[in-house]
Regions:
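Glycine-rich phosphate-binding loop of actin/hexokinase-like ATP-binding domains
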Residues: 120-173
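Hydrophobic alpha-helical segments within soluble ligand-binding/sensing domains
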Residues: 109-110, 121
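ATP-binding/phosphotransfer module of carbohydrate and carboxylate kinases, centering on a glycine-rich
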Residues: 1-58, 67-73, 90-98, 115-122, ...
Length: 298
């Protein structure tokens, strides 16, 4: 039995992988106290393995960074600061005497999609998630490419323009980034129907852009254009067979995926990249779980 664990800022999910399918997925609260969290986690693992611990062969974990991937230790997580130094790999290996493998959540999701989702059948897969943040992971022949400093594919930090300001991709194209950009432009005097709302979120910006609001349309257009800049960078660097896009902003094709395809066709230099294979991811919330369990694939 291989267990996959998806650690999030507020909840942690655990499942086992059997014949390529997730079985018996359960979740617990991600406690801020790492000791209490570990106690809850081991209680849940015991439920999965039952009395015969010999059934357990490995535990894979996908978790938010920063992480010391060499040692499986958490660093200063923005949402879980008290976890700094939490050696989850060492603790689990000590309790269960099985190998434990830890990856950042974007890479785990990329592996899950490559092996069990939209990347099945492709030798090279680049996965992007666009949601409250932006993450990316590169998979070659069903293996995660980490890079020399474990930073391969971290496109969220790509330098981009943000309406005349030097910025990075996450601040222009993630959900919160889109909202902040719209708020900033309104504060600088640009008119928008968004000002009539009692607060607004990414869905509101997108909805007003659909209705023809000029400011909302400009913000969404730039968010997509900067994502295209990131996609072209990946295409030029590693030339993957398929680029998968997941996360909340990929749910509606006309929000990000179709604009990315259109702009890619308009701006990419090489003809194969202008018609690159851009697809919607398939596994969504289960991608990290699939990927965590797949850290033990042959």
């Amino acid at each position: 039995m291989i267990l996959g664990i998806d650690i999030g800022a507020t909840k942690t999910r655990l499942a086992r992988l059997e014949s390529g399918e997730l079985v018996k997925s359960r979740k617990i609260v991600t406690r801020r106290d790492s000791s209490r969290f570990f106690s809850d986690l081991t209680d849940l693992i015991e439920e999965f393995i039952g009395a015969d611990r010999s059934r357990l062969k490995g535990i894979g974990i996908g978790a938010p960074g920063p992480l010391d991937l060499d040692r499986g230790v958490f660093r200063k997580l923005p949402n879980l600061p008290s976890w700094d130094g939490f050696d989850i790999r060492g603790k689990l290996e000590s309790v269960y005497d099985v190998p434990v493998r830890v990856q950042n959540d974007a890479n785990a999701a990329a592996l899950g999609e490559a092996v069990h989702g939209g990347g099945r059948g492709f030798g090279s897969v680049y996965y992007i998630t666009i949601s409250t943040g932006i993450g990316g992971g590169l998979i070659m022949n069903r293996r995660i490419i980490n890079g020399a400093n474990y930073l391969a594919g971290e496109i969220w930090a790509l330098p981009v323009d943000n309406f005349g300001q030097r910025d990075i991709l996450i601040n222009t194209s993630s959900g919160p980034g889109i909202v902040r950009t719209a708020s900033r432009l309104m504060g600088e005097g640009s008119a928008s129907s968004l000002s009539e709302l009692d607060g607004f979120d990414t869905e509101d910006v997108f909805a007003q852009a659909r209705k023809g609001d000029p400011l909302a349309a400009r913000v969404m257009e730039q968010a997509a254009r900067n994502m295209v800049h990131a996609v072209i960078t990946i295409l030029l660097a590693v030339d993957p067979e398929v680029v998968l896009i997941g996360g909340g902003l990929a749910c509606a094709d006309d929000c990000m995926i179709n604009p990315i395809r259109r702009m890619l066709g308009e701006t990419a230099f090489f003809a194969p990249h202008r018609s690159a294979n851009i697809r919607k991811a398939e596994l969504w919330d289960e991608a990290v779980l699939y990927g965590a369990a797949s850290l033990f694939q042959p």
